[in-house]
Amino acid sequence: DMADDPADAMQLRLKSKLMNAIIDHIEQAGLTQSAAAELMQVQRTRVNDVCNGRIDKMTIDALVAMAARLGLDPLQSAA
């Protein structure tokens, strides 16, 4: 089971926190998925994956880049 490995568990928690921070920002800023995709320099399908919680499709690297391009501090988002 993935959650049995502390490293896997931490990566999952980190991804989840980053995704939630990105979703919260998109909602609070009133951005469409297309507008958010443009800001984050990703395809709209990637934004859709985040908004639908498809955590398995996302890497920490990608989520950190997306958060940073929205002006979020991934380290604070992850706290």
Regions of interest found by a model, annotated:
Residues 26, 37, 67:
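The alpha-helix within a helix-turn-helix
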Residues 60-76:
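DNA major-groove recognition helix of helix-turn-helix/homeodomain DNA-binding modules
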Residues 54-60:
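Short, solvent-exposed alpha-helical "recognition" segments
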Residues 30-48:
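Short alpha-helical DNA-recognition segment
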Residues 22, 33, 63:
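Generic structural marker for isolated residues within well-ordered, non-membrane alpha-helices
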Residues 1-21:
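N-terminal flexible/basic segments that precede or flank functional cores
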Residues 51:
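DNA major-groove recognition helix of helix-turn-helix
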